[in-house]
Amino acid sequence: MTDFILNAQARTDLGKGASRRLRHSLSIPAVVYGGDKEAQSLTILAKEITKLFENEAAFSHVIELNVDGVKQNVIIKAMQRHPAKQFIMHADFVRVVAGQKLTAKVPVHFINEEAPVKKGGEISHVESEIEVSCEAKDLPEFIEVDLGNAEIGTIIHLSDLKAPKGVEFVALAHGDDKAVANVHAPRVAPEAEGAAE
């Protein structure tokens, strides 16, 4: 059972024009795919999906998708937002199959950021989410990055993070030890340098 529930209707009217008409009627087009079933086009009320994804945890939890009374467990795979107005324009969901691994992007939470700042450093958040591979039951709500011991010059890579049990960082599994955050000395503006001379 999941805390996140989303209602949808099957959609047969497809194409750009149909999607535009849907958005004008305060609904959005979506698709669900994966598992051993065919992809299915959906219609979801814009206010319902917007409310669901106001909670950051919904991005990294299993969602119960109720399509015309038929329930299935899914995760969000992709979401398209309007570039200027930020409302949701389209969503892709992937069915969750028990015992099978899935990939999902999980938000990064940085803690103890004040420690390097007190030492005169500035923090750059290089990644705001990390792609993980795991079974749905092991999907973490977020990945925690502790900056408490970071100094100026510290670069925190994926390999520096402890993955929760049953969870693998996808990039690291492919040999890409990405930087997640770094601490650097404050940059001095060129005008400030000139004024100091």
UniProtKB/Swiss-Prot annotation:
> Which superkingdom is the protein from?
Bacteria
Question: What processes in GO biological process is this protein linked to?
Answer: translation
Which keywords label this protein?
Ribonucleoprotein, Ribosomal protein, RNA-binding, rRNA-binding
InterPro entries cross-referenced by the UniProt entry: Rbsml_bL25/Gln-tRNA_synth_N, Ribosomal_bL25/Gln-tRNA_synth, Ribosomal_bL25_b-dom, Ribosomal_bL25_C, Ribosomal_bL25_long, Ribosomal_bL25_short, Ribosomal_L25_dom, Ribosomal_uL5_bac-type
Keyword set includes rRNA-binding? yes
Q: Does the keyword Repressor apply?
A: no
Q: Which GO terms describe its molecular function?
A: 5S rRNA binding; structural constituent of ribosome
One GO cellular component term, please give it.
cytosolic large ribosomal subunit
What interactions and quaternary structure are annotated? Answer: Part of the 50S ribosomal subunit; part of the 5S rRNA/L5/L18/L25 subcomplex. Contacts the 5S rRNA. Binds to the 5S rRNA independently of L5 and L18.
Matching HAMAP family: Ribosomal_bL25, Ribosomal_bL25_CTC
Record's family?
Belongs to the bacterial ribosomal protein bL25 family. CTC subfamily.
| Role played | This is one of the proteins that binds to the 5S RNA in the ribosome where it forms part of the central protuberance.
Q: Which named protein is this?
A: Large ribosomal subunit protein bL25
